[in-house]
Amino acid sequence: MRAFRLHPAHGFAFALGTCALLPLAELPSTVTLGVLAAVALIAAVAAYSGTAGRAKFALGLAAIALFGLVYAAAIGERRLDQRLDAALQGENVELAGHVDGLPIRDQRSVRFELQTVAGARELPRRMRLSWYETGVAPEPGDCLRLVVRLKRPRGLVNAAGFDFERQALAGNIGATGYIVRALPAQSECAARFDIDRVRDAIAGAIDLALPPGRIRATIKGLAIGDTREIDDADWDLFRASGTTHLIAISGLHVGLAAAIGGGLLWLLYWLWPGLGLRLPRPQAMAVAALLTACIYAVLAGYSLPTQRTLITIAAMLAGVLTRRELGWWTRYTLALVAVLLLDPLAPLSAGFWLSFGAVAWLILAFGRRWRPEPLWRAWIMPQLGLTVALLPLGLAFFQQASLAAPLVNLLAVPYVTFLIVPILLLALLLSPIAMLSAPIWQLAAGLLGPFDALIVWAADLPLSRWTLPAPSLVAWVLALLGILWLLAPRGWPGRALGAFALLPLLLPRSPALPQGAFALSLLDVGQGQATLVRTAAHTLLVDTGPGFPDGGDLGDRVLAPALADIGVQGLDRLIVSHDDLDHAGGTASLRRRLSIGRIDASAPGSIPGASLCQMGERWTWDGVDFEILHPPTTLPYLGNESSCVVRIAGAGGSALIPGDIGTTIEGRLIREQGDRLDVDVLIAGHHGSAGSTSADFLQAVTPKQVWYSAGYLNRFDFPRPVVVERVTAAGARQFNTAELGAIDLLFLPQGMQTPVFARASERRWWHEASAPPGAD
């Protein structure tokens, strides 16, 4: 058998195998994995036996790719097995564990991750917990004995938007839950030293030195990777200006720390040339660079992104440390394979793709022999090229790209990297002495002022928020190939033709609707409600999902991506049925992200610039009729009972959205507008509360389907069993977003189509599966 000689193609083959797992709805069975492993072994033996050749080289690549697939699938199966046993969901469980990472504190709760050390039953090694209404302030490394109520990681599933279940799997979170009560500590549960305790102390010192605000939050992110104070509005600002990569500690900052470490040792050798006789300078500088990067990465919390950066730096320095000449692509694939061997599920995170994608582009553009170029070209072209190169990745993960990013980063990258970050590193060195570090923190804050003004200006530019649908796999691959062609070296034939491969990115995933048709979507927003209605040329949103006490909401995380996914850049009309946080929580962030033609609300003055939602209003869009059935102008605002009730009727059917009205208003609607209530689809009132969706109302509406918008295992037990029984007696099919994810239904001229459930249509192997309750 021939000796194995490393080639960059081997690394790409292994990466391709691990990434092949991502689009699968189910993991391969154990038997299938065994067969694939055997095939890979046979292929490897055949490839590296006898004389070499192109066919055997290709066979070797196939074997390596299969090994990558089998390895990633085995780790994925193990991660899934480490999730909470379903039988323990909703039960009180006693456990002990260490606080891991930086706790997030707000007025109502403390949220943190816990590494378990003991428990009455077999439990996940890592879980995410909330502690409500507590005066306790746990610190990193504290060991706590607790009684907790847990559930398996379960997020919202829509056609686009944030995927918590993917994030939980990538972070090895096996359960989420809340703390019922704390128990007295025991001797086997002792606090441990944790670097996060140091980070928390530094964050406290920054709090004392600087006033609250975005600049202080940015300094924490840059200095110690602490993004707890950065709210959704700030993240939106950073995304719109294309500067997200600068805010939390990134590969760029760790790389700068490595460069400073190597540079300081170079200075030492310059001052004492005789050191080179004992230890060669290149190797010493490489070791110093790596050690400095390690220290900085640890201060940043040693998160997965910083771990990837350290591995990449080590791979890039491998040639120096081993005194071997290694090409850029060899070093790149060494880093790629090392990262994937350490964590084959790293491709679940956007950071993996963005960091390796950016480095690949830089090698493609500048890895060949360097040629002198004008300064403007040497600085501007990489920024423009990087924006184009990362466009498919940005759309795949965020459905958004900032066309202002190249301009902003031309100024922001050198300003932050070479001015702000070195000052922050100095402040970190001086942090044990508050009287010395405080002025340095304040200096950095003052210098961040121009950067903050720049991103605010950039975020207001017309093309700063360019949203597009999340690309299909085919469109994504075509775009990557097109970009490789477009950014090929000078002299490559027909480089401009690569732009045509980007055109599929512009295509909406949802088909155009004919006159008289409409699409009804009940988005998965947890314990809240948001209903999207789309006609041939118009879009209506009824309610904006829940907001949270810490200031976050689902406008950014769910609604904006869902609208971008169907190619909607703005809303023609927004109706906020009433002022409760679970229906109106996402309004502010949605107004910040999208243009909205008109806003209606039932609560006077609740939304600036909104019109009052009033009974009797009718309008027609593209052959589809809309009508407000409640509230009348004579009714004072009564909270739930003043909810806007919206009826939609098209050529293929009709739907009713009653908000949170109860049986009293239902009875009034039956008496006064009974002839308008007969519809095909009813969104259950008040999420399935026992005080709504009465038997009389169901008899008047006669729905074929009833949809519930509710949170998974919600504390209200919505939909209540009595409501489910009423709907069953009425003969309607029942669908619940808590079980099925977002629900989509087309009303076409030929009739009402079969509903589509996101937890089935968008299923990936890390998603929890659920059977439709009450569905045929």
Please describe what each predicted stretch is:
Residues 17, 97, 148, 222, ...:
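Divalent metal-coordination and catalytic microenvironments
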Residues 1-84, 88-95, 184, 265-280, ...:
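Transmembrane helix-bundle segments that form internal channels/tunnels in multi-pass membrane proteins
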Residues 9, 177, 231-406, 468-515, ...:
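Hydrophobic alpha-helical transmembrane segments in multi-pass membrane proteins
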Residues 227, 318, 340-347, 456-573, ...:
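Core dinuclear metal-dependent hydrolase active-site scaffold
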Residues 666-742:
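Cap/insert and terminal regions of metallo-dependent hydrolase folds
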Residues 243-264, 569-593, 682-696:
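Di-metal (Zn2+ and/or Mg2+/Mn2+) metal-binding site signature of metallo-dependent hydrolases
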Residues 2-8, 12, 144-146, 167-310, ...:
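Aromatic-rich juxtamembrane segments at the membrane interface
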Residues 2-4, 57, 62-245, 552, ...:
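Membrane-interface helix/helix-cap signal primarily in integral membrane proteins
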